[in-house]
Amino acid sequence: MTTEGDVLKLKVPYPNIKSGLAQKRHMYIFAERREKGKGLFVCTSKKPKHSKKGVPPLNRFEILPEEVPRTKSPFLRATLVDCDRLFFLSGVSVPLTLLTHPRCICREYLEKILQIKKNNQECEIIPLEINSIISLNPSLNLKVQNTDLTLSS
């Protein structure tokens, strides 16, 4: 079972199935659980272009591995958590094989990321289409929906 703070490695069909996020696995932080599913923020390696003002992600949290013990984060390089978009994954269960090692970020980081999201009134909510996400990540499992079936004797 996944919990808030876990870091997953997924291919995501955004903005479409041919995009960079769909071609190569990226890390996503499981930030919040709602009725509509799991909210995930994409992570990206920090690049020189990110030092310039106005370069997306505009709302971001930076993780610098050299400043924290390895147990607080699975990231090996300077990483930006993109708080401009929150992807929602629903109707699937995530196997442990898609989690990083260590599997999560520390609580302190998660709280800071959620505060950035709270302060960002324009955070885009993006629901992920279940068939596309499963076709890119076959180890994801469809969740069985509870139904009110009456069993006859």
What are these regions, as identified by a protein language model?
Residues I17-R25, F30-P69:
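Compact nucleic-acid interaction/catalytic patches
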